[in-house]
């Protein structure tokens, strides 16, 4: 096998969820059927890696120093929603009427993987909370072991700065049927049930 082909296969393997076989299929496809698409992909990738950075306020991806959401004076700066990734922020923007601002962790606490508070920019988050503008921190981390540990840490950080922490509700999906919901979700939903208003 050509060393250039091997390099291409290894390059595809940096993507999450892409193993040896998938990387090999992608490399063969680009070289056999999609050379022009491969050139566009290479140019777009090089351009993005060179020009896309992180917002100095929220850590989202942006081409400027401050992202469009943080620069928008119409957003409610008293509400700060903390999410694990830009994809989570996008999901909240599309599915809700949330008009506050965000802080993107770009991950979650995972000591075994060497990801601690510093890697998540929590020093910057603490500075933002200390400034006194934020009154509520909406913790929107995933319902995984690491996500829950991160949420606990964030709630403590919020309280240290006299900011009210809140957590996204978890439980039964809209339109879900009890018999098809996994045991963990059902147990959590049952344990955190609320009064019907």
Curated annotation (Swiss-Prot):
Belongs to the RecR family. Keywords: DNA damage, DNA recombination, DNA repair, Metal-binding, Zinc, Zinc-finger. A zinc finger (C4-type) spans 55-70. InterPro entries: DNA_Rcmb_RecR (IPR000093), Rcmb_RecR (IPR023627), Rcmb_RecR_Znf (IPR015967), TOPRIM_dom (IPR006171), TOPRIM_RecR (IPR034137). One of its GO terms (molecular function) is zinc ion binding. SUPFAM superfamilies: Recombination protein RecR. It comes from Xanthomonas campestris pv. campestris (strain ATCC 33913 / DSM 3586 / NCPPB 528 / LMG 568 / P 25). It holds the Pfam family RecR_C. Transmembrane segments: none annotated. The keyword DNA repair applies. Residues 78-173 form the Toprim domain. GO terms for biological process: double-strand break repair; recombinational repair. This is Recombination protein RecR. The gene is recR. The keyword Kinase does not apply. May play a role in DNA repair. It seems to be involved in an RecBC-independent recombinational process of DNA repair. It may act with RecF and RecO.
């Amino acid at each position: 096998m050509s060393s250039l082909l091997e390099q291409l296969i290894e390059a595809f393997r940096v993507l999450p969820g892409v193993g040896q076989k998938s990387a090999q299929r992608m490399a063969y496809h680009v070289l056999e059927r999609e050379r022009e698409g491969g050139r566009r992909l290479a140019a777009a990738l090089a351009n993005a890696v060179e020009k896309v950075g992180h917002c100095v306020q929220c850590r989202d991806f942006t081409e400027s120093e401050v992202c469009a959401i943080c620069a928008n004076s119409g957003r409610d700066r008293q509400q700060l929603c903390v999410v694990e990734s830009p994809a989570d922020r996008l999901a909240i923007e599309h599915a809700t009427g949330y008009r506050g601002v965000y802080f993107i962790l770009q991950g979650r606490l995972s000591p075994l993987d060497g990801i601690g508070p510093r890697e998540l920019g929590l020093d910057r988050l603490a500075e933002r909370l200390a400034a006194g503008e934020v009154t509520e921190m909406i913790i929107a981390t995933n319902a995984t072991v690491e996500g829950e540990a991160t949420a606990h840490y964030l709630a403590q950080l919020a309280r240290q700065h006299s900011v009210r922490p809140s957590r996204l509700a978890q439980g039964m999906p809209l339109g879900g049927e009890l018999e098809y919901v996994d045991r963990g979700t059902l147990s959590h939903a049952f344990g955190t049930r609320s009064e019907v208003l």
